[in-house]
Amino acid sequence: MSNPVAEHYGQPNLLERIDSAFASLGKDSAHLTTDDLAPVDQFHTGGMEATAEMARLGEISRDENVLDVGGGIGGPARQLSSQFGCHVTVLDLTEEFVRVGAALTPRVGLKDRVSFQQGDALRLPFPDASFDVTWTQHSTMNIPDKPLLYRELHRVTKPGGRMILHEIMAGPLQPIHFPVPWAIRG
């Protein structure tokens, strides 16, 4: 990996550590719910409540195609699909997150509604007008070229579609110094 964001977030053996944590709680990690996973996959400000509120305000509905850019291991994507019946594609720069998200999703019965793809938000690997909704939660802060990011999000959003963003927007215009509060290694 040569990208500092991918290097920071790409921790090895993440799935094994998640499985071990569930085993220590006496929980079968092969059969989970989105609520079970929330402590490990909803690490953005506001957690599941913020995701639900964003979805309500954004009027997410059944059978829409949603692109979750920087969606990590897929917590919000699984929640959206579970609660609203939409299909969600998670795009993340970090290969380990994509691998773990793809492994966890069948465990909550959503493998046909949530998919994962490794890729760069500044070069979205999708045709124009592919998604009803483009969605981000605390991922744009990791992307310095905001104008290009927003052009790419707009490009893949269908005419009349929605861009739904939950981001921290204010602060000094300096490079990000890891770890940011929601990405502390534990």
Show which residues each predicted segment covers.
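Short, glycine-/aromatic-enriched active-site segment of Class I SAM-dependent methyltransferases
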Residues: 168-186
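N-terminal auxiliary segments of SAM/dcSAM-dependent transferases
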Residues: 1-24
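A short SAM/SAH-binding and catalytic strip from SAM-dependent methyltransferases
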Residues: 132-145
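Conserved alpha-helix/loop element of class I SAM-dependent methyltransferases that forms part
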Residues: 27-30, 44-62
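A short glycine-rich, Lys/Arg-flanked "PGG" loop and its adjoining helix->strand segment in the class I
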Residues: 147-162
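Class I SAM-dependent methyltransferase SAM/SAH-binding core
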Residues: 65-123
